[in-house]
Amino acid sequence: MDRLDDLSTWRLFTEIVRTESLHAASDALAIEPSSASRFLRDLEKRLGIALFIRQGRSLQLTSFGKEAYEKIVPVLALHQEALENLRGDRARMEGSIRLVTIAGIGPAEITPALIEFQKIYPDIQFELHELRAPLPQGFTTPEGLVCDVAIGYKNQDPLPGIVSRYSGEMPFIPCASPLYLKKHGIPRHPHDCLKHTGILISSPTRSATTRLVCGEQSADLHWKTRLEVHNLISAKSALLLGAGIVPDMPLFHCHQELRNQTLIPVLNGWHRPSTSSYVFAREEAYAKRRVSVFVDWIAEREKRFFDELRADFAQFYL
């Protein structure tokens, strides 16, 4: 088969981009490195242009390679989805469900839920991925896999082609460790942050908070020094080590620490506006019984959890 028409060769190409290594891509796809190298050379020969700049074992995408990657990933995703639909019986409670979640909530909340669901339906298999882009783009992983279900936040804009199940409101808590507050004092107003270190979270699915509200008032945030991290786990680790103040820690990630007072709320009610939390599914995926049953089940489970948080921390829902 012509390499241009061979999707397995294109999948090898995307795997090399993802792993940044021909050998790692070969291992992932169970291909001999020599064969993988030959397939890649054949593909470039048929294209008439290089996909990679080769420097020893290092491979860097050419500008054409970047363009090819962006165009082929959706094609491979559609191919994978078509195969799954052809293989699967929509009415049966068996088969795979591919799930994507916000970084950080998987180990604490989602993994236990998947295990619980598999006890009820042992023929269901799960793949859990980390959300790397806002929805709906986030349904497709960097490897080109299309996910069935996503758990995350939603603004007011509707998502076309997406089924949504509301779970609850997520408050964001400005907080710091007692260790930090004992050394640096307690900020009571956003203006006080000029004397403090801000631990700021910036990721593919959220930007760093630069403004807080309190009732009808709002105020910009400015810090003496900043520590920027790219996921909630790193932010929480820095927070507990006394590195500074997180102005927007989701209550989900700090409720236990607030209970045992290893984290203390600051800024006297100033906060980032809360966000609505949802379980999402692509309409095509939701048409499968296993996906619809799972989505409705986990959405109800998440709602119970959010209701418990609201009852225990009513002060953050005013």
Positions of predicted regions on the chain:
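Central regulatory/effector-binding core of bacterial HTH transcription factors
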Residues: 95-159
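C-terminal effector-binding regulatory domain of bacterial HTH transcription factors
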Residues: 1-3, 70, 123, 251-260, ...
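Hydrophobic hinge/microswitch elements
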Residues: 219-265, 272
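Acidic, Gly/Pro-rich loop/turn segments at junctions of secondary structure
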Residues: 130-207, 211-228
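Short helix-loop hinge/linker segments at domain boundaries
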Residues: 56-59, 66, 77-100
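Residues within the DNA-recognition helix of helix-turn-helix
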Residues: 32, 39-42, 113
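A short LG(V/I)-centered, amphipathic sequence patch enriched
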Residues: 44-63
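Short helix-boundary/capping micro-motifs
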Residues: 14-30
